[in-house]
């Protein structure tokens, strides 16, 4: 089972679609196939830059694309639900047991409320997920009814992921429209998501 095959897997795509619909009905930002694909590619970029083997890069792409399928069941504990769903799907493939467990573990650990990085693959997935900040993720069209997460995403007009291998630093450069969200407000919301600062230690 490869990343390319997972991207075409009917079960995976159906779970992503339903999860995104559920979150849309609850007022959350976009969690569609676009988000899943971006997280997969960004997580792979992180591991590639740090010199991890192709096998790990392939596994993190699969985990990245599948990481939010648990939203089809419930937003609460979606990481754990997603891990169970992923295990069931991947059991039907030719993926070795050890690789399947690695993917399932990363998916189950990716949410800040219950998880945390335990290895390079889970760390790269968490970081990649948190760096998907973009205007196109906002579904609400009426700016007057934006919640804080809508404002943070809508305020971003451009993003660039920077990876400094020598200093072992990963940073996200953001271009922000101050008419939508002040710099203070932006960083105040980011401060609340303190979990984002923890996973880098999982990348040795």
Enumerate the language-model features and the residues they cover.
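Charged catalytic carboxylate motif
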Residues: 38, 81, 123
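Extended, compositionally biased eukaryotic interaction scaffolds
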Residues: 8, 17-23, 48, 52, ...
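Short alpha-helical catalytic segment bearing the HExxH-like zincin motif
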Residues: 60, 64, 81, 107, ...
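Terminal helices and disordered tails flanking the catalytic cores of nucleotide-processing hydrolases
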Residues: 135-204
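Histidine/acidic-rich helix-loop-helix segments that form or flank divalent-metal centers
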Residues: 96-158
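Acidic/His-rich, divalent-metal-binding segments that scaffold phosphate/diphosphate chemistry
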Residues: 1-78, 88
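Post-HEXXH active-site segment of zinc metalloproteases
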Residues: 77-87, 97-98
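Long, highly charged amphipathic alpha-helices
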Residues: 42, 84-85, 192-196
């Amino acid at each position: 089972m490869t990343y390319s095959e997972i991207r075409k897997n009917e079960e995976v795509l159906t779970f992503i679609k339903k999860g995104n619909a559920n979150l849309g009905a609850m007022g959350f930002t976009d969690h569609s196939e676009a988000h899943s694909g971006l997280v997969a590619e960004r997580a792979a970029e992180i591991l590639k830059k740090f010199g991890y083997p192709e096998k790990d890069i392939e596994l993190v792409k699969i985990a990245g694309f599948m990481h939010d399928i648990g939203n089809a069941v419930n937003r609460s504990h979606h990481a754990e639900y997603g891990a169970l769903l992923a295990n069931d799907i991947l059991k039907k493939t030719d993926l070795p047991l050890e690789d399947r467990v690695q993917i399932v573990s990363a998916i189950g650990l990716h949410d800040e409320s219950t998880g945390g990085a335990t290895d390079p693959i889970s760390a790269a997935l968490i970081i990649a997920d948190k760096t998907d900040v973009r205007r196109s993720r906002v579904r609400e069209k009426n700016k007057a009814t934006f919640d804080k997460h809508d404002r943070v995403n809508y305020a971003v007009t451009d993003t660039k992921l920077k990876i400094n291998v020598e200093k072992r630093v990963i940073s996200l450069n953001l271009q922000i429209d101050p008419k939508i969200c002040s710099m203070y407000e932006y960083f105040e919301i980011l401060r609340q998501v303190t979990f984002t600062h923890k996973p880098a230690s999982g990348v040795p």
